[in-house]
Amino acid sequence: MKFLFLTLFVCCFIAVLVIPSEAQIDINVSCRYGSDCAEPCKRLKCLLPSKCINGKCTCYPSIKIKNCKVQTY
């Protein structure tokens, strides 16, 4: 039982280290709804889903984009 628990713990620890979390980027585009952000994110080659947070579009970067702030939510 201890071996099973230890194996599970090690697997979870490795998964946390190996699988990086990506932050959303603020693309400096105003919005009212999440659907307003789909086209600007697509134009900048970002990944969906895009979100409208506090009146600003955010999306996940697929490549490094210059002049974007990294936001953590």
Swiss-Prot record:
Keyword field contains Signal: yes
Main location (coarse class): secreted
Alphabetized Pfam families for the sequence: Toxin_2
InterPro entries: Scorpion_toxin-like_sf (IPR036574), Scorpion_toxinS_K_inh (IPR001947)
Subcellular location: Secreted
Keyword Disulfide bond: yes
Signal peptide: 1-23
GO cellular component: extracellular region
One of the record's GO molecular function terms: ion channel inhibitor activity
Posttranslational mods: Contains 4 disulfide bonds.
Gene3D superfamilies in the cross-refs: Knottin, scorpion toxin-like
Expressed in which tissues: Expressed by the venom gland.
Keywords, comma-separated and alphabetical: Disulfide bond, Secreted, Signal
Domain notes: Has the structural arrangement of an alpha-helix connected to antiparallel beta-sheets by disulfide bonds (CS-alpha/beta).
Similarity-based family: Belongs to the short scorpion toxin superfamily. Potassium channel inhibitor family. Alpha-KTx 27 subfamily.
Name of the protein this chain belongs to: Potassium channel toxin alpha-KTx 27.1
Organism expressing this protein natively: Buthus israelis
